[in-house]
């Protein structure tokens, strides 16, 4: 069973929720070739966590029991036919640090948060069989695939990371490390808080005005005296700036606040909740 979310941009471009069995669901983009890589955005259903993390909480740092989180990770990775013990994940800090992952990093953060890559909000690799994973509850996940150089990446873009242009910087890091051509890279902007729900104060709005001066009208709206920011479009614009072509950018158009029955939402769930995972891994040959 496949459920479509958001808008289809032609038959090639769509985002869907796919049932993996045992009430486990993953969101995926149609343009990411499964012959080259596996990718997934975990829904909140089908896990062992209890309230306030109820469901498939994939994060070790939110207060959930570590053994339950590990059980959730194993369950979801097994459904994806990936090895949970090989996953690499960072300690996310809403920064702009990007780390190249090698075989020396295998398993970092898989079972122990203290062992995760420190102070990092984006990962890239060209190593097959090495799943990259970041955790989210409203912030924007951006995934990357270079099918020519066989490299992948993933970035965590909250409002601070978006203003720091971490998505753009990840593209350029792939260019530096792997010789990727931005025109070859596919990018996907996953489920996250939408422009309908990301209410901000004047201080945050001003950061976006300063960072995106030509696009203020696109990114900031006001409704009944409340300012809202469009994180999806802000990240799409910086992917274009990095050299990715518009037709190679997919957007889930799925708001985690509106769809919090499917995805964890920090805002909708009152601040204490679990985290979904965004995962990407090159296939082994």
Each language-model region and where it sits:
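Active-site microenvironment for binding and transforming phosphate-containing groups
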Residues: 2-285
């Amino acid at each position: 069973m496949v459920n479509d979310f958001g808008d289809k941009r032609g038959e090639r471009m769509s985002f869907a929720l796919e049932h993996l069995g045992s009430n486990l669901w993953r969101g995926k983009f149609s343009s990411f070739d499964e012959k080259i890589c596996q990718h997934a955005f975990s829904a909140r259903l089908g896990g062992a966590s209890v309230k306030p993390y109820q469901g498939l909480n994939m994060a070790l740092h939110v207060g959930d029991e570590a053994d339950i989180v590990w059980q959730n990770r194993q369950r979801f990775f097994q459904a994806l036919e990936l090895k949970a013990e090989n996953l690499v994940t960072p300690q996310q800090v809403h920064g702009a640090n990007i780390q190249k992952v090698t075989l020396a990093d295998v398993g970092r953060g898989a079972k122990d948060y203290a062992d995760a890559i420190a102070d990092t909000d984006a990962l890239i690799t060209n190593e097959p069989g090495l799943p990259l994973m970041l955790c989210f509850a409203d912030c924007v996940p951006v995934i990357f695939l270079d099918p020519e150089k066989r490299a992948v990446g993933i970035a965590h873009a909250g409002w601070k990371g978006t203003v720091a242009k971490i998505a753009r910087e990840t593209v350029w890091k792939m260019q530096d490390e792997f010789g990727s051509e931005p025109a070859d890279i596919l990018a996907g902007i996953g489920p996250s808080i939408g422009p309908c729900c990301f209410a901000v104060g004047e201080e945050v709005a001003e950061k976006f005005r300063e960072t995106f001066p030509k696009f203020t009208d696109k990114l900031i709206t006001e409704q009944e005296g409340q300012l809202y920011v469009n994180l999806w479009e802000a990240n799409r614009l910086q992917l274009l700036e990095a050299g990715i072509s518009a037709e190679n950018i997919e957007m889930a158009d799925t708001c985690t606040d509106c769809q919090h029955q499917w995805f964890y939402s920090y805002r909708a769930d009152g601040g204490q909740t679990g985290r979904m995972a965004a995962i990407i891994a090159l296939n082994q040959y």
